[in-house]
């Protein structure tokens, strides 16, 4: 059970990191009005 919970936590963290990276890439490619980011 512990191993399962750990694997689940890992998978969740991976999915979250992926989603975050996707959202960041999207924001960088198409910044909303007033967005201050890497592109300034």
UniProtKB/Swiss-Prot annotation:
Would the keyword Ligase turn up in this protein's UniProt record?
A: no
State a GO cellular component annotated for this protein: extracellular region
Give the modified residues of type Arginine amide.
39
Q: Which UniProt keywords apply?
A: Amidation, Secreted, Signal
* Tissues where the protein occurs: Expressed by the venom gland.
Stretches assigned to coiled coil? none
Q: Which domain of life is it from?
A: Eukaryota
Signal sequence segment = 1-3
Show the propeptide residue ranges: 4-29
Quote the subcellular location field of this record.
Answer: Secreted
Any further remark recorded for this protein: Is very weakly abundant (1.81%).
Say which family it is in: Belongs to the formicidae venom precursor-01 superfamily.
Q: What does this protein do?
A: Venom protein with unknown function. Does not induce paralysis when a high dose is administered by intrathoracic injection into the blowfly Lucilia caesar.
- What protein name does the entry list? U2-myrmicitoxin-Tb1a
Organism expressing this protein natively: Tetramorium bicarinatum (Tramp ant)
Question: What does the record give as the organism's lineage?
Answer: Eukaryota, Metazoa, Ecdysozoa, Arthropoda, Hexapoda
């Amino acid at each position: 059970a512990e191993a399962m919970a750990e694997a689940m936590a890992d998978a969740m963290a991976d999915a979250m990191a992926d989603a975050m990276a996707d959202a960041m890439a999207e924001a960088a490619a198409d910044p909303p009005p007033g967005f201050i980011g890497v592109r300034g």
